[in-house]
A protein has these predicted regions:
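Short alpha-helix in the alpha/beta-hydrolase fold that links the catalytic acid
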Residues: 141, 155-165
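Short beta-strand/loop motif that positions the catalytic acidic residue
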Residues: 139, 145-147
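Conserved acidic catalytic loop of the alpha/beta-hydrolase fold
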Residues: 1-11
Length: 201
């Protein structure tokens, strides 16, 4: 972002982040608040969804594993990419887009995402703590958080809590936008939903 500001002086810099990238984008906007003119967070991971395991317990277990040197071990039920994900179990609301990206992912190792580890969960805890305790106080640009209606990957309550904190600062234009019919991967929605999503952005 700093390089973009140097190469294109005078132009507004809009920061967009999705999922875990949304949480990271929020931290970036807090770290250098005067750099950004807009912040757009799509299904942001303010905190991952660990249900049915309570969040405090999940963090405690992750900390113990990390202290014991097991940060690279996968969480229960998680495994490396194997290309067998089914549409019915996915975070996509459009089967056509799901199949399109699944084919691309199968051919390019760099697109193949692995599952969550104990180390990842512990770092997610640190991210959540930073966002809810410090970062929200420093964000100064207009912010839009897009929340999926059928979200299962990240905590909707934490998204709402984060927006409420931003709104406490009267000079901040922060809004939560609920996207009907969508799942976590909003870019894999049906054409009508996706068009409305991009129009609002």
């Amino acid at each position: 972002s700093r390089i973009a500001a140097q190469e294109f002086p005078g132009l507004p810099i809009c920061l967009y982040g999705h999922s875990m990238g949304g949480g990271i984008a929020a931290c970036a906007a807090a770290q250098d608040p005067r750099l950004y003119s807009r912040l757009i967070l799509s299904s942001p991971m303010i905190r991952p969804n660990t249900a049915p395991t309570p969040w405090p317990l999940a963090c405690l277990v992750a900390k113990v594993f990390c202290m014991a040197g097991g940060e690279e071990r996968y969480l229960p039920g998680n495994h490396p990419y194997d290309g067998t994900e089914q549409y019915a179990d996915s975070a996509s609301a459009s089967q056509c887009r799901f199949l399109y990206y699944q084919e691309k992912r199968s051919k390019e190792p760099l697109f193949q995402m692995n599952a969550a580890s104990y180390g990842w969960l512990w770092q997610s805890h640190r991210l959540n703590r930073n966002l809810q305790k410090k970062a929200w106080r420093r964000i100064s640009c207009p912010t839009r958080i897009f929340q999926a209606e059928n979200e299962t990957y990240v905590s909707k309550k934490e998204q709402e809590r984060f927006v409420k904190k931003l709104c406490r600062r009267k000079r901040i234009d922060a809004k939560l936008i609920r996207v009907k019919g969508s799942k976590h991967e909003m870019l894999n929605s049906d054409p009508k939903t996706l068009e409305a999503y991009w129009d609002k952005i």
